[in-house]
UniProtKB/Swiss-Prot annotation:
Gene Ontology CC: tRNA methyltransferase complex
Pathway annotation: tRNA modification; N(7)-methylguanine-tRNA biosynthesis
Organism: Aliivibrio salmonicida (strain LFI1238)
Catalytic function, reaction form: guanosine(46) in tRNA + S-adenosyl-L-methionine = N(7)-methylguanosine(46) in tRNA + S-adenosyl-L-homocysteine
Protein family (similarity comment): Belongs to the class I-like SAM-binding methyltransferase superfamily. TrmB family.
EC number per UniProt: 2.1.1.33
Function: Catalyzes the formation of N(7)-methylguanine at position 46 (m7G46) in tRNA.
Cited InterPro entries: SAM-dependent_MTases_sf, tRNA_(Gua-N-7)_MeTrfase_Trmb, tRNA_methyltr_TrmB_bact
Protein name, entry field: tRNA (guanine-N(7)-)-methyltransferase
Taxon lineage: Bacteria, Pseudomonadati, Pseudomonadota, Gammaproteobacteria, Vibrionales
Enzyme class: transferase
Gene: trmB
Length: 238
């Protein structure tokens, strides 16, 4: 398992510092997480390289591809892969404990249609994701960066919407979910302004939680406390 960070440079050779949507709060791996990475990486892990993936080589078939950015500890992603064996899932997460937990859960569940990466998703999209190949891109509960001075760190922004659009297949879907109303409004504003997308909601801007997105323990607790969750789906239309 390797980790590589790309740097951009000015004409003078100075490094351009990128604004990232995440902070590496790297906790210790448990023995189980570390063991899962050691045991499962060769079959379920994908190292970052500056080369476009061939999904048939990655999964051994040409089934539809669902890609999730920031899967946390991976419980929901593994559950989705279990319930949809004829769909291929790729999860990207920057925190190694989450990657280890996801691999451990996937091994226990016996899923074979799931692969994971431990890298910055933006760099993965720029270098490795084939054009017109992703059926659904999932972004569930990303860091809201709720302080106004940190809004520039939010992953959903005009540049991101532009970058992912050519990776979605014809009528591919970008599915977002957040429990911060301000971030939901921001997502709608960004995506409404982004060319080549249409909101699939039929009543207002948001949709009910789709059956394919599992209800997390965190989300269920939020519901009990009266907290809202906003699901948003935009379809590529150009």
């Amino acid at each position: 398992m390797t980790e590589v960070t790309k740097n951009d440079f000015t004409e003078e050779g100075k490094i351009v510092r990128k604004i990232r949507s995440f902070v590496r709060r790297e906790g210790r791996l448990t023995k189980g997480q570390e063991g899962a990475i050691t045991e499962c990486w060769s079959t379920m892990g994908i190292d970052f390289v500056e080369q476009v993936l061939d999904w048939n080589e990655v999964f051994g078939n040409n089934n539809p591809v669902v890609l999730e950015i920031g899967f946390g500890m991976g419980a929901s992603l593994v559950e989705m892969a279990q319930k949809a064996p004829d769909v291929n899932f790729l999860g990207i997460e920057v925190h190694r404990p989450g990657v280890g937990a996801c691999l451990a859960a996937a091994k226990e569940a016996g899923v074979t249609n799931l692969r994971v990466m431990c890298h910055d998703a933006v760099e993965v999209f720029e270098s490795m994701i084939p054009d017109s190949s992703v059926t659904t891109l999932q972004l569930f509960f990303p860091d809201p960066w709720h302080k106004a001075r940190h809004h520039k760190r939010r992953i959903v922004k005009a540049e991101f919407a532009e970058m992912i659009r050519p990776k979605l297949n014809a009528e591919g879907v970008f599915h977002m979910a957040t429990d911060w109303e301000n971030y939901a409004e921001h997502m709608i504003e960004v995506m409404n302004a982004a060319p080549g997308y249409e909101n699939i909601a039929t009543d207002g801007d948001y949709i009910p939680r789709p059956d394919e997105r599992p209800l997390t323990k965190f989300e269920a607790r939020g519901h009990r406390l009266g907290h809202g969750v906003w699901d948003i789906k935009f379809r590529r239309n150009a």
